[in-house]
Amino acid sequence: MFLAQEIIRKKRDGHALSDEEIRFFINGIRDNTISEGQIAALAMTIFFHDMTMPERVSLTMAMRDSGTVLDWKSLNLNGPIVDKHSTGGVGDVTSLMLGPMVAACGGYVPMISGRGLGHTGGTLDKLEAIPGFDIFPDDNRFREIIQDVGVAIIGQTSSLAPADKRFYATRDITATVDSIPLITGSILAKKLAEGLDALVMDVKVGSGAFMPTYELSEALAEAIVGVANGAGVRTTALLTDMNQVLASSAGNAVEVREAVQFLTGEYRNPRLFDVTMALCVEMLISGQLAKDDAEARTKLQAVLDNGKAAEVFGRMVAAQKGPSDFVENYDKYLPTAMLSKAVYADTEGFISAMDTRALGMAVVSMGGGRRQASDTIDYSVGFTDMARLGDSIDGQRPLAVIHAKDEASWQEAAKAVKAAIILDDKAPVSTPSVYRRITE
């Protein structure tokens, strides 16, 4: 039997905690036998003293084990259970293509996703732009969809990593969110509860990233790869660029539209294609569905070209209570904004920088995201035809097309777009879509 205050004291004095001590504390968070003050105290000691790799693995696994851990063995699936997690960005719609693409190649993708957070869009919010789409099927239905379709994208239920929910809420109000061991534990507890064979992490870098610097993004990616592999799940990470909006659109319905167009081949933004393919390649190799990069790319290109990936997406939408002909008739179903018109720069030049975070917040301000949990979302608003870094801007080329609910909202968004996009008289050096691959 342990005492919570003795565990806090031990960590406060700079000592490593044992697996048993960490499990006792995390189970106490779940059972409400540990107070909020004690959670806050431990979080702050971890913030200042960090954690060893064994401590990080123990923390993650204890939080994973605080609730249900999905087990797929009884389904006798003929492929690996694989998933991707992104630290979030603007126009980051990769999940909607990646899940169906990997499923079409023989993987099973039980993706448990989140809502928008701050300036970043949420996969669940995007999917809810589809009429009838059910993000909370019951456990049996979730398993059926994975077995039949190969991919389902759902919301986190209260049975998955419940200790994390309480731990995170306390961190949020005690300035201890940005601790790498605590971020790692929080992300991986939920992902590892999916019962995965392999995971790929997409850690964003740049002006729209969760971590403020390249070095911190890299440190987080390395921590996640180390802890997840330590917990027995084959994991790699990619550092990908978020110095500009990833897709050509940012919002909810507008990003779903772009995802369908990507899958059908109607339109594929080159950077979005690069990042999506790179993540899918990792999933195929880690899931042992391809032996190397070349084989993985060949398989992925084939399921895009033959329509199989688009078909899987359509079947997922139908299985989750969306329209059965969504892929064929997406424009019939997706909401459209009252006012859609282009915004132009006041000067001419090359786009040299973009405040991606500010562009994400502009979508939130239009009603496309939440400032607080109780807010309702306007799924129709957002940006399309986003200009890219290096584009030559003049009176002919707009910075973006803004989809807004009224003129006042459009004007406010136009002001934000102009302020967020910096023009220069010479083109910037182009940045890669993927900076680095991190393995154990």
Curated annotation (Swiss-Prot):
One of its GO terms (cellular component) is cytosol. It comes from the Bacteria. Coiled coil: none annotated. Gene3D superfamilies: Nucleoside phosphorylase/phosphoribosyltransferase catalytic domain (3.40.1030.10), Pyrimidine nucleoside phosphorylase-like, C-terminal domain (3.90.1170.30), Transferase, Pyrimidine Nucleoside Phosphorylase, Chain C (1.20.970.10). The keyword Transferase applies. It is an enzyme of class 2 (transferase). Keywords: Glycosyltransferase, Transferase. Pfam families: Glycos_trans_3N, Glycos_transf_3, PYNP_C. Its EC number is 2.4.2.4. One of its GO terms (molecular function) is thymidine phosphorylase activity. It catalyses: thymidine + phosphate = 2-deoxy-alpha-D-ribose 1-phosphate + thymine. One of its GO terms (biological process) is thymidine metabolic process. Pathway: Pyrimidine metabolism; dTMP biosynthesis via salvage pathway; dTMP from thymine: step 1/2. Belongs to the thymidine/pyrimidine-nucleoside phosphorylase family. HAMAP family: Thymid_phosp (MF_01628). Homodimer. The enzymes which catalyze the reversible phosphorolysis of pyrimidine nucleosides are involved in the degradation of these compounds and in their utilization as carbon and energy sources, or in the rescue of pyrimidine bases for nucleotide synthesis. This is Thymidine phosphorylase. It comes from Salmonella choleraesuis (strain SC-B67). The gene is deoA.
